[in-house]
């Protein structure tokens, strides 16, 4: 019986080391299952899987940012580890290029400088010939002024002012009125005839100005004070001293040769005061004084007729006192 008691224990003792040395059999009999350990939650953060955790997001970032604390360059195996795993989830963020010295900081300045140089170099090449040859060239700047004239340069004040010198003496009795339409020239001339005696005026054929010569400088200054005045509620008139020497010289020659033409016909038709130089035209018209005398001669009072007068006798006074007449 003792032999039978020892025999069954022997194989158990011999089989126990075989079970311990076998890598495929589980440790306890109750927990023996056919599922891997990581699916059952048996992963207590072992030490051996740390080298393989480079592909993890948290450990990978730690591996990449570790050179910042160490102050050295990142290890070379880290860079190809992310390129090989194309099907795996992303290991680093899109902003890691800026924070990582090995991957982002060092190439960024070089790439930015390259981009700036590439972007700016064609701009400089394009703008330099344009600004240097076409825009700021003295020859090109002077060409448009020679070929085309601006509206200000077509103004007679611009062309006449260039011909004046410091030695020229202008007649202060001449003024230039401008800013009115051609249809209102007679109306404007009539308005300026109120400021003084107009000896002569020269109307522009195509422009909107005319030169007026007054009898005295004081009258010309009075006309100059009307610069910017509005006539007829729709016409603003400008008045400036006349600077056209040709008009002044022609006027002086005309007065010396034929003084009767000193006053032009438009002024006579507007009813301005007549001058001695206009006597040939006035002689054909009946004077106003003669017309006045002819119209009032039939209505003069005749001295022979007796006009009724009030009776101032004593009887009439007594009757007026008594009866209240």
From Swiss-Prot:
The keyword Protein transport applies. It is found in: Nucleus, Nuclear pore complex; Nucleus membrane. GO terms for molecular function: identical protein binding; nucleic acid binding; phospholipid binding; structural constituent of nuclear pore. One of its GO terms (biological process) is nuclear pore organization. Gene3D superfamilies: 3.30.70.330. The keyword Protein transport applies. The modification Phosphothreonine is found at residues 106, 128, 264, 272, 274, 279, 307. SUPFAM superfamilies: RNA-binding domain, RBD (SSF54928). The modification Phosphoserine is found at residues 53, 55, 66, 73, 99-100, 121, 137, 251, 258, 278, 283. Residues 1-37, 69-94 are annotated as: Disordered. Keywords: Membrane, mRNA transport, Nuclear pore complex, Nucleus, Phosphoprotein, Protein transport, Translocation, Transport. One of its GO terms (cellular component) is nuclear pore central transport channel. Belongs to the Nup35 family. Functions as a component of the nuclear pore complex (NPC). NPC components, collectively referred to as nucleoporins (NUPs), can play the role of both NPC structural components and of docking or interaction partners for transiently associated nuclear transport factors. May play a role in the association of MAD1 with the NPC. Interacts with TMEM48/NDC1. Forms a complex with NUP93, NUP155, NUP205 and lamin B. The interaction with NUP93 is direct. This is Nucleoporin NUP35. The lineage of its organism: Eukaryota, Metazoa, Chordata, Craniata, Vertebrata.
């Amino acid at each position: 019986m003792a032999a039978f008691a020892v025999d069954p224990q022997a194989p158990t003792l011999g089989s126990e080391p075989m079970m311990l040395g076998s890598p495929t059999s589980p440790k306890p009999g109750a927990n023996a299952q056919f599922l891997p350990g990581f699916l059952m939650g048996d992963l207590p953060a072992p030490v051996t899987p740390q080298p393989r955790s480079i592909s993890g997001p948290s450990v990978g970032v730690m591996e990449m940012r570790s050179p910042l604390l160490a102050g050295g360059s990142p290890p070379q195996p880290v860079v190809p580890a992310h390129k090989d795993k194309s099907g795996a989830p992303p290991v680093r963020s899109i902003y890691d290029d800026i924070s990582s010295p090995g991957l982002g900081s060092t190439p960024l300045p070089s790439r930015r400088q390259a981009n700036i140089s590439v972007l700016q170099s064609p701009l400089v090449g394009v703008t330099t010939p344009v600004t240097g040859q076409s825009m700021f060239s003295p020859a090109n700047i002077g060409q448009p002024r020679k070929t085309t004239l601006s509206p200000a340069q077509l103004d007679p004040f611009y062309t006449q002012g260039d011909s004046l010198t410091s030695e020229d003496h202008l007649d202060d009795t001449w003024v230039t009125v401008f800013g009115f339409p051609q249809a209102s020239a007679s109306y404007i001339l009539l308005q300026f005839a109120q400021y003084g005696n107009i000896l002569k005026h020269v109307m522009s054929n195509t422009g909107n100005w005319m030169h007026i010569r007054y009898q005295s400088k004081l009258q010309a200054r009075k006309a100059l004070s009307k610069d910017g005045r509005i006539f007829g509620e729709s016409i603003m008139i400008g008045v400036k001293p006349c600077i056209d020497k040709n008009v002044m010289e022609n006027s002086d020659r005309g007065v010396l040769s034929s003084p009767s033409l000193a006053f032009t016909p438009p002024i006579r038709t507007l009813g301005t005061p007549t001058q001695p130089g206009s006597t040939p035209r006035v002689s054909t018209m009946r004077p106003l004084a003669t017309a006045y005398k002819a119209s009032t001669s039939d209505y003069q009072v005749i001295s022979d007729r007796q006009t009724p007068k009030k009776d101032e006798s004593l009887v009439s006074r007594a009757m007026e006192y008594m009866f209240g007449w």
